[in-house]
Amino acid sequence: MEYKFDFVTKSNRYNNKYFAMDILEKLRNDSELAEKLKTVCDVDILDELKEPDDYDGHLTFNIQGKAFGRDASGSEYILLDDGTVSYVGSEGQSGRMAESIEDFFELVVNCPYWIDCLNKELYKNTGKLNKKIIELEEECLEEEYEEDGTSLKEVQRELAAGLGIELVENVADILIKFYESGNRKPRFIVTFKENDGSNTHGSGILFN
């Protein structure tokens, strides 16, 4: 049986650009919290909002925005003009991640392994999704993130408290919100202009 997930819009408070600026500024001013976010969630907050990398004019975007962070591969997290957050991968994949900056941090803190949950088959029923979550959490829990041996769960609690977001028990709910946001329209489309002048349009969906 395939589950159907209804998209629910967040309140304006969480789409408010002022809230986004507040949480980003907090991270810029708290190097310890920012380092934990970088180490555990692979989100390196930029010193300021910047134009997304257009690869020397080869990339264009159907929704404008500013990059606020990068991961270790050079992929960018972009706060779009409509208040949503999208991902532009260094290997060409791109799409919306979250309906607001709060939803974005809720996702990466609760699910630092989100990038391993892009198989759309996982979302056909909750059993598959929960099984994948258990597997990934077991892998993550084996890792130590601090010199003193601090566990993933401990760092997640610190990040959630520092960012003022909820650390949830049912991670599947967070991933379902991610899936809903990533599949709704209008999609975030990245177009690559080839050297011969032709264009290649992305699907606007991270899931495959």
Regions found by a protein language model. Name each.
Residues 1-92, 123, 138-208:
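A surface-exposed partner-binding patch
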Residues 91-128:
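Compact, glycine/acidic-enriched structural inserts
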